[in-house]
Amino acid sequence: DRANEIKVNTHGSDVSFVVNRNINYTNICSFSCNFCAFSKGRGHDDLRGKPYNISHSEVIRRTEEAIKRGATEVCLQGGIHPSYTGQTYIDIVKAIRSSSQTIHIHAFSPLEIDHGRKTLGISTYEFLFELKKAGLNSLPGTAAEILHDDVRAVICPDKLSSNEWLEIIKTAHEVGLPTTSTMMFGHVENMSHVADHLLK
């Protein structure tokens, strides 16, 4: 009740939504998160489906199809493909922009940002700036799971630490890219971990 009261006092009772299409460009991933039912990477060969890595033309086709169906945004995410570089991510954004100058591109988790900038040997700021210049509009705050390192050590030990994740999000804001933030719960966390995540 208190949370709703704060929300109403801050934002009123208006509710909005976005018509969005999620485009997963690859399910090939070098990470091995314990909870993932999506990845076709290490230790995940038994999961349903085959590995895929879709082409730029397919990303464009799906974007154009989304626009025809009334979407105003595409969200792009995928596994951390071992052969992807930062240029791969930039080129995906450019491919979409070659097809539409108006669709909102909401793409790449902090984990993808970290992977991309490392492959190019540049800072997080520089990489995010290049993505924005290519046409990126905002970042999804995924790969957050629970922003508590005790939990992350159990469910995703090879992912970014809580502080690393937060620094990438803060840097995105400095570049002028708004972000969201997600929380995955119902696994090994307790309510103090959830509270800590929300406070961050």
Residues covered by each model-derived region:
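Active-site-adjacent beta->alpha loops and helix N-cap segments on the catalytic face
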Residues: P82-I96, S100, D150-W165
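Generic structural signal for well-ordered alpha-helices
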Residues: I60-T63, Y89-K94, L128-F129, L166-I169, ...
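Active-site loop-helix segments enriched in His/Asp/Glu that coordinate
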Residues: D45-R61, H81-S98, S123
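Catalytic cores of alpha/beta
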Residues: I122-L128, V188-K200
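N-terminal pre-triad scaffold of radical SAM enzymes
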Residues: R2-G43, P51-Q77, L139
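Short, well-ordered coil/turn segments that N-cap beta-strands
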Residues: N9, S13-V15, G70-T72, S100-I105, ...
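Active-site mouth loops of central-metabolism enzymes
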Residues: R21, S39-S57, L111-S123, V154-D158, ...
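Conserved strand-turn element in the central/C-terminal portion of the radical SAM core barrel
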Residues: V74-Y84, I105-G116, L147-D149, C156-P157, ...
